[in-house]
A protein has these predicted regions:
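ATP-dependent carboxylate-amine ligase
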Residues: 1-121
Length: 121
């Protein structure tokens, strides 16, 4: 997912377009996506990830601000990643509650056939 870093006074869409163009030239069959904010990009990639995937957020590192124009806005990739992961986990827990009829979200009991141990040959 291509997004903004510190666009300063440059047009962020122009920067993203140049990065996307280069990425498509390097990998024409790649699934290259664009998000107009880092928070949206992190949300999208975390929601898109499947079990076993690695999500790597690059660009800002330890920085806790994003310079847009002449204004420094608070932004911390680590905080945003934690928030996005919490949201996905909350949605997953809500989905499990709905599937198994458990609304207290404290424990989830699988249907009996899924609880029974399987015999191994």
């Amino acid at each position: 997912v291509v997004t903004d870093d510190n666009p300063r006074t440059e047009d962020p869409a122009t920067i993203r377009a140049a990065v996307i163009k280069g990425a498509r030239e390097a990998n024409p069959d790649g699934d290259i996506r664009e998000a107009d904010s880092r928070a949206k990009a992190i949300d999208e990639v975390v929601a898109w990830a499947q079990p076993g995937d690695a999500v790597i957020v690059v660009g800002k590192g330890h920085e806790v601000g994003q310079l847009i124009g002449d204004t420094m806005h608070h932004f911390d990739d680590r905080e945003e990643m934690a928030r996005a992961l919490d949201e996905v986990l909350r949605q997953s827990a809500d989905g499990a509650s709905a599937r198994y009829g458990d609304n207290d979200k404290k424990s989830h009991t699988l249907p009996q056939e899924q609880n029974e141990p399987k015999e191994h040959a």
